[in-house]
Amino acid sequence: NTTATNTLSGGSRAQRGTTRAAHIVGVTVKDTTSYFGWGKASGADFTIDPGLWVIDSFGQTVIALIYNGRAFEWDASLTAATSTRATAITGTEVPTASRHMLVSTPDRHIVFLGTETTLQTVASQDPMFIRWSTQESLTEYTPTAINTAGTQRLTDGSRIMSAIRGRDAMYIWTDTALYLMRYVGLPFTFAFEQVGTNCGLIGKNAAIEVDGAAYWMSENGFFRYTGKLESMQCLVEDYVYDDINTRPRDLIFCGLNNLFGEIMWFFPTSSSEAINRMVSYNYLDSTTQ
């Protein structure tokens, strides 16, 4: 009311998360003592994963996946491409929740990792499940007798961390192991081989491939794969692992300076939630710095 009469009219109220106490609009409210408190604040901790994107090319079409979300496409061949927004890839068979995405070349299959076991059902997302499209398709993911779409579930680990393309296979890391995914054609399309255990990836951007060899940072050391798994000698390993913060693990990333033959890992120390330290490895003379 605009005049102080100690009465309220035409009001309703409710508090989210508490027992509802509402007053119908149009009825005079004289006594509002029927209320409930907000309750005690929760002291539980929780972690929100960073909103990371994966971007790959499918010819002149750019495919982008938001971490644990859906994929988008952007056509670079359009006349007004720079003023055209990316759009979600639509269709009744397109996955809507995935941890990672990669385009297999030269066979041109789109591979979703840590994705849904039941298409377009977010609740069915399995962090160890892999699904790929039929050849040359953005929208067909249901395996049939006449296409090359398919699925595979990895077994060693609790979640797929990341994947990168290599010279003759794709490298797929879980939190505990390394797998190779190779295109073999019909009838299986892809073959999977586990080539390492106790060598999982520490963060989704902590691996790189250089001259046919994969290098990565794990929870328990630095590794290389050149056809066989190798634990890399590192004189500063204790310096790194005694003071690393693994809570924001997906912020840890790997970079390459091929001018000087260096692979670099950037990571946060135990006193920081952001990147503030770097360790480098010279793959030309096999030294760490």
Cite the ranges covered by each PLM segment.
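N-terminal beta-propeller domains
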Residues: 32-39, 95-179, 266-283
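Beta-sheet-dominated scaffold domains
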Residues: 155-289
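Surface-exposed loop/turn elements that mediate protein-protein interactions on large endomembrane-trafficking
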Residues: 72-88, 121-151, 180-191, 223-237, ...
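A short beta-strand motif characteristic of beta-propeller blades
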Residues: 36-43, 84-92, 147-154, 191-196
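Small/polar beta-strand repeat architecture
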Residues: 1-51, 78-83, 93
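Structural signature of eukaryotic scaffold interfaces centered on beta-propeller domains
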Residues: 35-59, 93-107, 153-166, 203-210, ...
